[in-house]
Amino acid sequence: MSESIQPDNDGLFTRIRKIFAVLGFLYLGAVILLTVPWIQSHILYMNALKLPWNAHFDAPERHGLAPGKTANIKIQTADNHTLGAWFILSDTIYHDMSFPPPPSAAELHISEAVTQRPTVLFFHGNAATRALSMRVRLYSGFTSRLNANVLAIDYRGFGDSPGTPTEDGLSLDARAAWDWLIAQGASPQDVLIVGHSLGTAVASRLSVGLSEDGVKFRGTVLMSPFSSLYTLVDTYNIFGVFPVMLPINMIPRAAGIYKSFLIHKFDTLSVISKLKVPILILHAEDDWDISHTHSDALFDALLEPYLPPVYSPPVSQELWTTQQWGEYHTQLVTRREARESLLTRTVIPNFGSMDQFDGFGERITLLKTSTGSHNEVGTLEGVQDVIRVTFFTPEDLR
């Protein structure tokens, strides 16, 4: 009689333990490496990933833009860095030229373009360059559906812009791009500041600086923003599934200690309430890179000054009296009703929803789309139409 074959459960469990031990070792090693400032910066900016490889910045046509529509320019910053940038003509200005125009046509029409058409000042996210195909599609949408010019820069250390990116350095780059537009003859009220992902922190800081200087510009658009780098670390999930900080959060106080090693802040949440212009915050609900809850937090920070506060008794909840619980509940109900009365919600079938309110005399909008992911949300025609109706008049589009 043959002997039955029994599974080697002990061997299987041993292999599983080894796999988890290796994964734990790799995780611990990655966590330790990310406390090193040089490695931390490279992971955050990913500027060494210069996609597309061998980009032809002096020939934008090779990346999908129309012949003679884009000027490849250089912008000098206050700390003597030179930034590569593209200035792309609006369709109205471009279509007034004979086709095909000479290669230098866009450069010759910059002053005319910025005085006759609105301009989108665009700040891209981490990694890659201004020539990335997704970004080029975004420019094309802005120049056609918004009929606006576009100025897109590569920060220091990105693309053909030499240097090393830093939080303060990117802020100087943004201000240099703004100053360049104004020097070409653009009116501040004709400039719409748009940022995507990492670029939302750059756009927010520039917008706050301009607001504090009393400059009235057209507005600010934050596409797929994060509230702060600290919060992003807490909420980031690999492939949208595996929470990066979960093992660390299981150790008391370990997360706080770890985040103390972060050398970058990019804290938009702490400054966004200083903006005094129309604001559009937009996010795709299927964004696996940055959760759309970050946009909720930014929108709530803008709404907070207009809501009644909620006061808690200065003792532990276990010691609250029935009366104190009742008063606390009443405050919550009053706050919820105040929020509902301030907000106007618009549901757009098969697309998403918008919440809007008027703060400090300006319209604040939160747009959530059902699709678009992290990188493509700005290329959606519906998103560009929301930007159009939020910031542009019919006269702007003629």
Located regions from the model:
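N-terminal membrane-anchoring alpha-helices
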Residues: S2-P67
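Membrane-embedded segments
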Residues: A78-W178
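Gly/Ser-rich "nucleophile elbow"/oxyanion-hole loop immediately N-terminal to the catalytic nucleophile
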Residues: P165-D168, D179-V194
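Short beta-strand immediately N-terminal to the catalytic nucleophile in serine-hydrolase-like folds
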Residues: I193-G195, V221-M223, L282
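Gly/Ala-rich beta-loop-alpha elbow adjacent to hydrolase catalytic centers
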Residues: G195-G199, A203
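Hydrolase active-site cap/lid region
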Residues: R205-V271, W288
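Short beta-strand/loop motif that positions the catalytic acidic residue
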Residues: K274-K276, I281-H283, D287
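C-terminal catalytic histidine-bearing segment of alpha/beta-hydrolase fold enzymes
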Residues: D289-H292, D296, L307-R398
